[in-house]
Amino acid sequence: CYSLIDQAKGVLALAGLLCDIGKIRVRPELLSRASGLDPAEMIEVRRHVQDGLDILAKTPGLPHAVLDAVATHHERHDGSGYPNGLQGVDIPMFGRIMGIVDSYDAMTSPRPHAAARAPHDAVMELYEGRDTLHQSELVEQFIQTCGIYPAGSLVELSDGRVGVITEVHALKRLRPSLMLLLDEGKQRLPEFHSLDMGVTFEDAHGRPLTVKCSLCAGAHGVDNFELFLD
């Protein structure tokens, strides 16, 4: 049967697709500008929330929870968000969740005014902002779900190889699956190889194999966004 959990997932998926639909009414030059916006321009950009609701109002059959999420995904736990400065539990649950997802997506995607950040760094910033920008319990659940090194993270292993995380294992979050891209000398592999750290515990020299660190997108000339497009 179609459970409440399935319904919630459907709402979040649809809200994720539609939350910024109002930006189609924002002047493109404002969205692509690398420098800051003046107050009037900021008001215009922030109006995308109401513009999105106006567009979706013409779409019959959308769950009210989806509209709530679209309306409130820029609200923040401490009241510093927009458009209405809602605080805490006054923000609908799906809006609170979408706020976390939207923040994470913004930090890990290349933008005109900022380079994409490593997923690990974005997760840490979300954690530091818990109970200020976002509800603590939801942030911690998001991190638990994604793992310390979320899928899409570019990482270096203890033996020097570099890869992109493709899957995080629920019971072994520090031992993900990867697509290996570079060898120990940071040279591109002729063919990409899969590695499941959940079953591979040692490197070629018999030493413990671990994730050494998270790397920024573009490190060592690797564009992991391009990889997923390919």
Regions inferred by a protein language model and the residue ranges of each:
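Histidine- and acidic-residue-rich, metal-dependent catalytic cores
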Residues: 1-230
